Amino acid sequence: MDKPKPKPQPEPYGLIPRWFMEQTLGRDCGYKQWLRTTFGGDIAERLIADYYIGGSAEGDAVFWQVDSADNVRTGKIMSYDPATGKRHKGEEAYTDWVHSVMRREGALPEGWQLKQCLYGEHLLKRRPNEIVAVAEGAKTAHVGSALMPDMVWVAVDSMLGITSERLEPLKGRKCIFFADEGRGYEEWKERLGPIAHGVGFQYLLSDFVEEHAVLSGGDIADMIGYEELRERNE
């Protein structure tokens, strides 16, 4: 009888030193300012603390990916307008990754490999019995957590972030997926069934954004009446 083949070992991946993340947490940035003016100080500070929202030396937001073992995988650096909460356009636009910056500066060892995790994954173990809301982007997760805090909000970073590997931490959980309007919704509708079956989680794909979005490619964050929220917090 043939011996069973050994299970393939997971590919090794690199981590970012935790102190590197921690030094960004005390820095302010336009995105944090927008959170405070929109949702009020208490909610904003909860979001900033829960999601480890950092700031770069240049004033950009850093959205850290911290896994369920509290390891820092990487961070996404993005510039936001503090008045509108929207990403800067044109010459002011900036998007980068912490691991890419460190690699360019020679601060990572040779052979360092990235393995992304769910944004907000570290929150799952803190709230093991609550429904998980899965969004595409970090900002949508923040807005969702501010307005619907009874669910644990995480994000997959992009439309194509729906993979068995990325969603493995959802095993045994009940989940609601909020895809962005348009192609994202159709992509998730096609892919989620087999992934949920393989990983072992229950899910509902919400069509709220698909039914109510005005702009193509819209998400929950695009649909919120921020002016009304600001007036309530003034």
Language model features with spans:
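TOPRIM fold recognition
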Residues: 68, 85, 129-132, 138-234
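TOPRIM metal-binding catalytic domain and adjacent DNA-binding surface shared by DnaG-type primases
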Residues: 1-73, 123-128, 231-234
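Phosphate-handling DNA/RNA-contact segment within nucleic-acid enzymes
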Residues: 62-171
